[in-house]
A protein has these predicted regions:
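Hydrophobic alpha-helical transmembrane segments of multi-pass inner membrane proteins, especially
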Residues: 22-24, 28, 45-240, 281-341, ...
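Glycine/serine-rich anion-binding loops at beta->alpha junctions
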Residues: 116-126, 166-168, 256, 260, ...
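Alpha-helical transmembrane segments of multi-pass membrane proteins
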Residues: 25-40
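Membrane-helix interface and discontinuous TM-entry motifs in multi-pass inner-membrane proteins
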Residues: 157-171, 251-266
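A juxtamembrane structural motif centered on a specific transmembrane helix
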Residues: 1-13, 334-403
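Long extracytoplasmic/lumenal interhelical loops at the membrane interface
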Residues: 256-290
C-alpha cells in the first residue's frame, strides 16, 4: 500500500523533490499563519468570519500548486520561444495598468480580470517575462556578448520594464533590477557592458524614485529608516521608526524562541498588513524564532537548489532561467524578512508563498514549476541515456547468444 502511494507521488510530481518539498512546506505555513493573521480585517469587515478569508486563501494556494504542476510538465525550452511575446504583452499590460489600473494607496499596480473579478499585478508577469527574455538573449549569443545590437537590446528591455514597474512599485522594480544584474553577471556579460546597463537602470530608477506615483512615500520610508538606524543604540529607538515596525518588533519580542502558540498573536490586531507584507513577525510571534529561521533556510535552499539545477542544465537558457527565477524568489523573501527586523526600509513586498495573495501566489507557483521543469530537462535526458545504454547492452548479449 505504501509503495503504491509512493508510486503515485512519483508519477504525478516529477522532477526535483526538494523544490516540491519546500513548496508544500511554505504553503502549509502560509495557511496556518494567514488564518490567524486575518483576524483584524475579518472582525472589521465580516463580523469575525475568518473562514471567509481562509477559504479564499486556500483556493489560491491550491491554484498556485496547480499552476506549479502544470508548468513543471511543460518542457522549459517552450518558454524560450515564447519569451519575446511574453515581454511585449507584459509591457502593454504595464502601460494599461499605469493609465487605467486600480488605484490603491496612491499607486496603480493592479488590473481587474473580467468575469472572475480578480485583481492581479501585471508586474508579477513582467518579472517572469524579462527574466526569461534575458536568459534567452544571453543563451543564444554566448559567443557574441559584445555584439552592440545585443547590448542595446538588453539595455532597452531592462530600462523599459524596470522603469514602468518603478513608477508605481519602486521596491519591486529594485528587486527585479538586482535579479537582472545577477543574471547578466552569470551570463558572462563583460564588465564594461555590465556597467553601462547598471548606470542606465540606476538612472531610470532615480527618476522613478523622485517622480513616481509613490515617490514621496519611498523617500519618507528611506528617511524613517535612516532615522531608525541613527537611533538604534538609544532608548528612543521605538519612537524613531514607523508604527508598523514598532508593532513588528513587539511581535518578534513576544514570540521569543518558541512563540506564544498558534492563534495567540496579539500584534495581529495592530500590525498593518499582518497577513501580507508583515506576516513574518506574526510567524515568529506565534511559532517563535525557530520558525523564522526555518523560513529563512527554506528560501536559501530554493536559491542554492536553483544554482545546482542551473549548473547541471543541458542548455544555457535552462541554467540562466533557473538562476533568475530562484534568485528572484529568494531575494524577495530575504528582503521581506530584512524589512521586518529593521535591516532595510519598508518596501511593501510580500513574503513569497506565505503572505496572503491572489495572482502573485500563483505566479510564484509557476516560477517554482519552471525551475523543476529545468531539472526535468537534464534528469529525463540522463534517464534516456541510462535506458539507451541498457538496451545496447541487452542487444549485445542477444547477439552473443545467437552466435
Amino acid at each position: 500500500m505504501q509503495k503504491n502511494k509512493e508510486h503515485i507521488v512519483l508519477k504525478y510530481l516529477k522532477g526535483d523533490k526538494v523544490i516540491w518539498g519546500t513548496a508544500f512546506l511554505l504553503a502549509t505555513i502560509s495557511i496556518l499563519v494567514v488564518y490567524s493573521a486575518v483576524s483584524a480585517p475579518a472582525f472589521k469587515f465580516f463580523g469575525g468570519n475568518t473562514e471567509k478569508f481562509l477559504i479564499k486563501h486556500v483556493i489560491f494556494v491550491f491554484a498556485a500548486l496547480g499552476a506549479m504542476w502544470v508548468t513543471h510538465m511543460i518542457p522549459y525550452r517552450a518558454y524560450d520561444k515564447l519569451s519575446r511575446g511574453f515581454l511585449f504583452l507584459a509591457i502593454v499590460l504595464l502601460i494599461i495598468t499605469l493609465a487605467f489600473g486600480v488605484d490603491i494607496h496612491g499607486a496603480r499596480r493592479w488590473l481587474i480580470i473580467p468575469i472572475v473579478n480578480i485583481q492581479f499585478q501585471p508586474s508579477d508577469f513582467a518579472k517572469f517575462a524579462l527574466i526569461s527574455n534575458l536568459a534567452s538573449m544571453l543563451a543564444k549569443r554566448q559567443g557574441k556578448i559584445e555584439d552592440q545590437t545585443l547590448i542595446w537590446q538588453m539595455i532597452l528591455w531592462v530600462v523599459v520594464v524596470v522603469g514602468l514597474i518603478a513608477v508605481a512599485d519602486f521596491s519591486g522594480a529594485m528587486l527585479l533590477f538586482g535579479t537582472c544584474m545577477v543574471l547578466l553577471y552569470i551570463g558572462r556579460v563583460p564588465l564594461k557592458i555590465f556597467a553601462q546597463i547598471v548606470m542606465g537602470g540606476l538612472a531610470v530608477l532615480s527618476v522613478a524614485f523622485v517622480f513616481g506615483q509613490r515617490g514621496q512615500t519611498a523617500i519618507s520610508r528611506v528617511d524613517q529608516w535612516i532615522n531608525g538606524v541613527e537611533n538604534s543604540n538609544s532608548a528612543n529607538i521605538v519612537n524613531s521608526v514607523p508604527d508598523q515596525l514598532q508593532y513588528a518588533y513587539m511581535a518578534i519580542a513576544r514570540g521569543g524562541l518558541t512563540g506564544v502558540g498558534p492563534g495567540n498573536s496579539t500584534m495581529r490586531y495592530f500590525l498593518p498588513e499582518a497577513f501580507s507584507d508583515f506576516v513574518f513577525p506574526i510567524c515568529i510571534e506565534e511559532y517563535g524564532m525557530i520558525l523564522g529561521i526555518v523560513i529563512m533556510i527554506i528560501y536559501l535552499i530554493i536559491m542554492f537548489r536553483g544554482m545546482s539545477i542551473a549548473s547541471r542544465s543541458a542548455t544555457a537558457f535552462g541554467g540562466l532561467l533557473a538562476i533568475g527565477l530562484s534568485f528572484s524568489l529568494a531575494f524577495q523573501g530575504l528582503v521581506n524578512m530584512a524589512v521586518a527586523v529593521g535591516v532595510l526600509p519598508v518596501t511593501g513586498l510580500p513574503l513569497p508563498f506565505i503572505s496572503m495573495g491572489g495572482t502573485s501566489f500563483i505566479f510564484t507557483g509557476m516560477s517554482l514549476g519552471i525551475i523543476i521543469s529545468v531539472y526535468r530537462g537534464y534528469s529525463d535526458l540522463a534517464d534516456d541515456n541510462i535506458e539507451g545504454n541498457a538496451i545496447k547492452k541487452a542487444e549485445k548479449k542477444n547477439v552473443k547468444v545467437e552466435q
